[in-house]
Every structure is written in structure tokens, then in C-alpha cells.
Amino acid sequence: MWTPTTRVHYSRRAIRYQSDLTDEEWRVIEPHLPLAKATGRPRAWPLREIINAIFYVMRGGIAWRLLPSDFPPWSTVYRWFAAWRDACLFERINHALIMTDRELAGREASPSAAIIDSQSVKTTEAGGPRGYDAGKKINGRKRHALVDTDGRGLILEPHPANIQDRDGGGPLLQASRRFFPFIERAFADAGYNHERVTTATIVMVEIVRKLPDQIGFAVLPRRWVVERFFAWIGRNRRLAKDFEATVDSARAFLYAASVMLLVRRIARAS
């Protein structure tokens, strides 16, 4: 419920654009960005402006070339994005911020339970890998997400939409063992009830089935948390569809959206 106190707490009117980092948010993310090299040409633009520009593109759903003139040149911003994408920087920042946010919430840094689900979205003429999801009747890509019980995005992976959940779930759980080795249980829907998922790792997969008398939509235990995560990152218009020509860029934007959520949450709690 909104109150005068919460409205002031969440207000972003004092900054240039709604997607810009506040001073508190910059202090959260700055330690995780690469330091300037001791030799060579000095940076022409501060990294804070580069991050602000990337978040602006993601939040507004615009093309790189349409960046306003008060940001660094679009080509400079894109080069930084591509370098960070190839270095998996957003994934590493996301991992570090998840542990920080969990500890601020009074929980263990690494989760012991998670929820897995997928979301199919359309692609555009940009090209790249895609497929047809016969169940959702969508030609595009599928976003697989593994989130903790509070809805933080642990592992995010896009791939062609024709890959079924039972084929995409196993690799996602295997990837989680590297960053979150203490996960013991994963909740999932019936699409993951297959040995390719249940035997992929030592994580026990618990299927949360629909209610016996369920007709239409219903909020199901555990599973709603990952749906809420998709709704959270879906506020970024760049993610309304998959506009990226490569899966690597699509993955980087998914993690960047998760990082934006975590940075704001940690800054408010600090």
C-alpha cells in the first residue's frame, strides 16, 4: 500500500531519467565494475553513464542508435555492452548481488531451494536462433529461469522456443551447481517431470501440480514466485520481445534486468 512515506522512498523524480542510477545505487554496483587500466588511453566516458545508457535502452526498449544525445555515443555504449556481455559481467554481478541481498534479508547467502519455469516470447526480424513453441503457439525463444524462493533470478538462459522444458531444465540445474551448490530442492511444473530433469543433478525436483478442480488460472504454491520474476523483468520494454540477434545478447539483457532489480532493492535497504 502506497503511503506518503513510501512514495518519497521510491520516488525517482530527482534524477534525469527513471532508469538512471541514484547515488546510493551507484555505490552498490560500482565495486563490481572493471577498474581502469593503469596504462593506455584513459576512459573518455565514466562507467556510470555507460550503465545508465544500457539501462535506458533496456527500460525503454529503444534501438541503440536512438540513445539521447546527453548519453555517450551509441557506438561507445554498445562496445561496452558487447565487451561485458562476452565477459559474462552481468551474470557475475547478479551472482554477487544475490548473495548480498539475501544476507540483508537475514538469509544464508546461497539458497537451498529454487523454482524453475520458462517463458516463451516472440522474436523479430533481427534473426538468430529461434523455434516454434507448439504449446504456446509462439515462434521465437524460450527464457528459462531458476529463481530462489523470494524471486531472485539465479540462473537465466534463453534458447529457441522449440526446446521443451524437459530438455532445457536439466542444463539449467547443472549450471546452478557452479554458482549455487547448496540448492537441494527445485520446484517445477509437470513439464519438468522427466528423467532428463530429475536425474540431471543431485537436486531433488518436486513437481507442483495443478489443483484437481482447477479451471483456468490459479495461483499455485511456489510456482507463482517465478511468474512474478518474469513480470518484474517484463517491465523493461526491451524484454517485451526478444529483439536480439544473438542468444548471448539476449542472456546479457536478462541478467542486466535482474541486476537492476537487485541494485534498487539493496540501495533501499542500505
Each predicted region: which residue ranges?
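Short alpha-helical elements
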Residues: M1-S270
